[in-house]
Amino acid sequence: MEPLISAPYLTTTKMSAPATLDAACIFCKIIKSEIPSFKLIETKYSYAFLDIQPTAEGHALIIPKYHGAKLHDIPDEFLTDAMPIAKRLAKAMKLDTYNVLQNNGKIAHQEVDHVHFHLIPKRDEKSGLIVGWPAQETDFDKLGKLHKELLAKLEGSD
């Protein structure tokens, strides 16, 4: 199979640890070095690389080496590994302002069905992630009821 992108600076080394992957997933193919990437950091549980369709210079993706479409599908040890990598990348890029973004599901703007975290530098008002959503008026009675319901559900969960 011919690589999608070919350049001498792309990484195609074998991954550092076995993982639960999906043969059809583009991110799993990157982890397995079937597709080259601009790899930045690789650990036993995670793989970080530069996004090839960046929102800003330095836009990176951090992906668990475990295939799962949604955050709740991923074992904790893989999730625990991701944020220190985001921190390390932000420090390496000397970022004072940035976004860490993670979407779950198509209508939540997830484009690849493999959990991933975006580290998006925000160097000025026009570059990087531009977010705007309508804030709702707070109904404190409704919010209090939701709070109690969630606490009850959390009591019986991990």
Swiss-Prot record:
Listed GO biological process terms: nucleotide metabolic process
One Pfam family recorded for the sequence: HIT
Residues annotated as domain HIT: 26-129
Residues binding AMP, per UniProt: D51, I52, N103, H109, Q110, E111, H116, F117, H118
Active site: H116
GO CC annotation, single: cytoplasm
Cofactor names: Mg(2+)
TM regions (residue ranges): none
Assembly description: Homodimer. Interacts with KIN28.
Further remark: Present with 5410 molecules/cell in log phase SD medium.
Function statement: Hydrolyzes adenosine 5'-monophosphoramidate substrates such as AMP-morpholidate, AMP-N-alanine methyl ester, AMP-alpha-acetyl lysine methyl ester and AMP-NH2. Plays a role in the regulation of kinase KIN28 function. Essential for growth on galactose media at elevated temperatures.
PANTHER family linked to this entry: ADENOSINE 5'-MONOPHOSPHORAMIDASE HNT1, HIT FAMILY PROTEIN 1
Family as reported in the entry's similarity comment: Belongs to the HINT family.
Protein name: Adenosine 5'-monophosphoramidase HNT1
Organism, as annotated: Saccharomyces cerevisiae (strain ATCC 204508 / S288c) (Baker's yeast)
Gene name per UniProt: HNT1
